[in-house]
Structure formats: C-alpha cells, structure tokens
C-alpha cells in the first residue's frame, strides 16, 4: 500500500544496495505532464513545471523521475501532436490537463495506454475505460457534500434558484437529487430570472446555483432575501461582494470549499523555485493548490512505480488505486477521491467571506 505523509513520502527499503559500500542506482520512470501554457489558464504552466520538478528532486535518491511537459491546447490537432510527443518520450504515466475540454481530448487519444492522474477538478464525464485518478474532488462531489451539510440541519423547505447555463442546470440537478435523497421534505427549483414566482415563496433555505447571474439576482431581490432563514452559495458564485450596495443582505450566507491542502513550507519552496517571493502575499491563491496536487501526483507516481516494481500500466494502476492517505484508501474504484473534508465559509455584513468552521460529509 502507498502512504504519503507530509511533503516527502517514505520509500526507504523499497530497493536494496548491491553492496554495503556502493550507492544504489535509483530506478527510473518517465512522466508526461500536460501543462497549461495557452488559453485562459496560460499562467498555470510555469506553476505546474516548478511543482513537478520539486517532486522529482525530492524523489531523486529513490526513483529517478524524467519529466516531459506538453500543452494539449484546445483543439484536436494540438492534442494529437502533444500526445505524440509524450508517446515518443515513452512515458509510463500522464498528468492530465487541468481543463475539462483538453482532458477529454487526451482521454480520447490515449486509449488507456498509461495511467492518468488528474491534478485539478474535471467534469465527471472526463474518463477513459480505465478511470482517471483524481487528486481533487469533482464538482459533483462538492455539490453533493453541500446537500449533505444542508440536510443535517433538517430544513422543511429548500428553494434552489438556478441559472439557465449548463453550470446552473447541472448544479441544480445534483442539489435537488442530493437533498431529496437525504429526506428533505420539500425541494423546489425555479429559474433565477423568474423573480415574481420566487417572491411568492418563503423557503427556510435558499441555494443560489449560478455564476455571473448571481449579481443581478441579489440586486433585484435585496428586499426579499432577509426573509430567508439561511442562504447558501455554490463554488461558482462564492466571491467577495463588498463593492455592491446590497452586500449586507448576504450576512450569514454560507458556502463550502475543499480544505486547502498546502502548507507554509511548500508555498515557500514553490515561491523560491519560481523566483517570485511576492506569491506569498496571498497564501490562499488557487495556484498553490494546483501546485500541491501536481507535486503530490509526481510523488504518488514515483511511489507506485516502486511498489509495482514495473512500468506495466495495469500494475501501476493497481498500485495507485491501493495508495493510502492517513491510513485509509485514497481512491474509490472509480478513481474519485474517497474522503474529502471541507472548510465552511460565512459572509459578514460587508459582503466578504471568511472561514468559520469545518465539515466532513463522511
């Protein structure tokens, strides 16, 4: 079984020196890292590179990790070319792109040739016949966890208002299903633009399932919102609203996000590797979580390689699926994270949010 503890995994004793005087030569594996050098997340590539290299350096005495970095882009042509270079590199394992559209292309063209680890949240339909191993919770896991938290307070009525885009519809469906399954007596769903219909309802709990349309909704319904006992937001609209005149109406509103896995030591190492000490001024920046999961993925891959004693794809997958975190299996058989803990955020009178507690859906 694989166990990661702290920033460095213990792999002592996996292989033996051929003599007491000679230093053993570490076995070698190859990892392809699909970085984001273009598109809206163009800035992430340099972060992914630095994190992967840190992990490779930390593993150097036990397994030599050779890395190749490729950008899958957002077109079939770019993805094919990037994967062709990864295959020419003879990679044993792949870190997936951090955007779902690019990850779908990679899944389409790899055809289960090697295990794939996802280091960022991807859509639930991103998979091969052999599942991606996800080091972050999926969007659906986060939404179902929110439904679990809400249901534990036993509300009698819950109203979900949702936007007309795909995000709003998907979140609404997951929430409605999760709440109903958990015994909430009355769950209503209404489009976010149906303001007259919404005003006629007096729900105990309101969930706003939208992104950009949330601002318009809050503005139009500022006089109605105080009548709701508890408001919840979703990851897509968890934001700072201090600039808006209606911000105070969000006081007491709650939301959840997966707990930040990074440490001050890791953030400092990353900033130093990048030569960008200014990054430390915002320790909650999302780039640190991406960097950590990239670092973690390379460590996990190296340990799986040693456990499997082979670069055979099936052996590597088995070793990865059997990996543990805090004494428990890390992944479900589907490749999803088995246990995810959350930070609960609450809004103050100024329309900004801050951590106020923890939640575990397990």
Show where each model-derived region lies.
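Extracytoplasmic ligand/sensor domains, especially the bilobed periplasmic-binding protein
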Residues: 92-184, 229-251
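Short beta-strand segments enriched in small/hydrophobic residues
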Residues: 25-50, 58-60, 97-98, 158-161
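Hydrophobic alpha-helical segments within soluble ligand-binding/sensing domains
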Residues: 134-159, 170, 193-195, 214-215, ...
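Hydrophobic membrane-insertion alpha-helices, especially the h-region
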Residues: 2-15
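Periplasmic-binding protein-like
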Residues: 86-98, 117-119, 157-162, 202-218, ...
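Short beta-strand elements in bilobed, periplasmic/extracellular small-molecule ligand-binding domains
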Residues: 61-73, 130-131, 179-194
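Segments of small-molecule ligand-sensing domains
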Residues: 275-356
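Beta-alpha junction/loop-to-helix N-cap segments that form part of ligand/metal-binding clefts
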Residues: 43-48, 58-126, 200, 212-216
